[in-house]
Amino acid sequence: MSESVRTNTSIWSKGMLSVIVAQFLSAFGDNALLFATLALLKAQFYPDWSQPVLQMVFVGAYILFAPFVGQIADSFAKGRVMMVANGLKLAGAAGVCLGINPFVGYTLVGIGAAAYSPAKYGILGELTTGDKLVKANGLMEASTIAAILLGSVAGGVLADWHVIAALVACALAYAGAVAANLFIPKLVAARPGQSWRLSAMTRSFFCACVVLWRNGETRFSLVGTGLFWGAGVTLRFLLVLWVPVALGITDNATPTYLNAMVAVGIVVGAGAAAKLVTLETVSRCMPAGILIGVVVAIFSLQHALLPAYALLLLIGMLGGFFVVPLNALLQERGKKSVGAGNAIAVQNLGENSAMLLMLGLYSLAVLVGVPAVAIGIGFGVLFALAIAALWIWQRRQASY
C-alpha cells in the first residue's frame, strides 16, 4: 500500500487519522497492561517496592535501545515500524497471559514501546509541519491521554473482576493497533542507506545527542520533557500506595480512576496549548510546569476523594499545557538538524533516564519506609524547584 502524502496536509487526513487510531489502541494496551500486571503482582504477593521495578525494566529497554531505534524509524516507512513494534507489544502481553514471568513479558513490551515512540512522533512531522505540527501534537496527546484514561480504568476494573481477562484485553488492544497500522500510508524513509554497524549507530546517536544538547531550544525541550514524564510516571505509582493510606481504599480500581482524572486534565491542557502557544512563544508553558509541583504537594495532604479528583484534574491540565509545546519544539528543530526519528530517540533517552532515576529514588524511599504522604510533598516541592531552575536557565540562555 502506498500513497503520496505532502507535508502541511490537513491534520484530519487519512494518514493522520490512521496514526491517531493506532496510537490510541497501542496506548490503551500500555496503560491497561500496567495496572493489570500490578494486580497480578499483588495477587502473587510480590513486595510493594517491586511495583516501580516493573516500570524500571520497561524504561530500561528504552534506554538500552535508544541508540538504535531512531535510525530504525528514519530508515524505514514509519507506519511499518509502528506495526512491527506493536507486534512486539502483542507478543509480550500474550506471554504474560500464558504464564511467563511478568517482568520478562513487560520487558518485551518495553522493547516494542522503545521502537514505537520515535516512529509515532516522527511521522507527525512527515504528515504536517509548522504551527499545524503543534495542533497535530495536541491531537496525538489528546488521543494518548484518552487511551490512558480508558486503558488505566479498564485495567484496574477488569483486574478486580479477573486478572487474566484484563491481560487478554490488553493483548486484543495491541492486535487492533497492529491492524490499524496497516492503514497508515507508506511514506518514503526519511534517511535511508545509513550504516547498520552497531558501533556506527551508537556513534551516530551520541553525535545527535551532542547536536541537540548544543542547541539552546532543543536542550530546553529535552530537559523539560524529561522532568515532566519522569515525574508523571512516579506519580502513577505514588497513587497506588497513597490511596490506601490517605483514603483508606484498597481496591485496584480507585488509583486508576485518579490517574484518569490526570488524563482528562491533560486533554484539556493540550487543547489549550494548541490554541495559545506557538513555537515562538514556548516559554508561556513554564509557569504551568512550576504549578504542577505546587499542586502535587497540596494534593498529597488530602484525605477525601472529591478534592483529590479535582486537584488531579488540575495537575493534568497544567501538565498538558506544559508538555505539548515542548514536544512540538523538539520535533520541529530536531527534524532539521538530526532527523525526527533521532530527535525523538534522544528525547526518549532523556525522558526514560529521568524516569529510571525518579522511580529508583521512589522505590528506595518506599523500601526504607518513608510515608506515602511525605514522599508526595517532597516530590512536588522538588519538581516545582526544578522547573523554576529550568525557566531561569532558559531565560539566561536566551538573553546571551
Curated annotation (Swiss-Prot):
Pfam families attached to this UniProt entry: MFS_1
GO MF annotation list: lysophospholipid:sodium symporter activity
Segments traversing the membrane: 19-39, 53-73, 91-111, 139-159, 164-184, 195-213, 227-247, 257-277, 281-301, 304-324, 352-372, 373-393
Membrane topology value: Multi-pass membrane protein
Domain of life assignment: Bacteria
Keywords: Cell inner membrane, Cell membrane, Lipid transport, Membrane, Transmembrane, Transmembrane helix, Transport
Localization per record: Cell inner membrane
GO terms for cellular component: plasma membrane
Family affiliation: Belongs to the major facilitator superfamily. LplT (TC 2.A.1.42) family.
Protein's job: Catalyzes the facilitated diffusion of 2-acyl-glycero-3-phosphoethanolamine (2-acyl-GPE) into the cell.
UniProt name for this protein: Lysophospholipid transporter LplT
Native source species: Salmonella schwarzengrund (strain CVM19633)
Lineage: Bacteria, Pseudomonadati, Pseudomonadota, Gammaproteobacteria, Enterobacterales
Gene (UniProt): lplT
